[in-house]
Amino acid sequence: KKQMIFADSVRIGGDHVTSDLSSGLQIPSNTAERIKTIHGGVIATSMDDREMIDVDGQTGDWDHDRRKFTRSEIIGIIRPRIEEILEEVYHKLQAARFDTLPSQRIVLTGGASQIPGMEGLASRILGQQVRLGRPLRVHGLPQAATGPDYAAPVGLALYAAHPQDECWDFDLPEKRMGAMPMKRAMQW
């Protein structure tokens, strides 16, 4: 059955990637966000060394405002932060003993999950099947809210509106650290 069996979040995300680009390239945040969205990626190819990206600044200094960066430079700033995010996800999954649960498919949500190459890199770091989450078949949902950046809030709202009544057909792992076993907490 398709049902949510685990959910969590990390404290870092796409805004941190934008901030890294902004400080690394010394450009305004709105320009960094545009570059991340249009030219971002996590896997560099040989062509990325030749692809030049024009960056328009807003300082009034012509030489500083009209600069070019290679796509490889952009990826070189983005990838370390994405790796940090995915490693944090990996540690959360390990702490939750996710590998003992029957479904081991990970759904990435949020705007940064759309960065090209994210699914492949996530699969390598997390060692799991990964897919991009997006709200599908939601009647009345505005077009602007159908992307992965809205998948988590829309999905949680749907989950709350239509709770799953059926019982799980697997045992949850028990915590070994003296706390209430997870199984008992779920029965509560």
Annotate each language-model stretch with its function.
Residues 2-188:
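Helical "lid/coupling" subdomains associated with nucleotide-phosphate turnover
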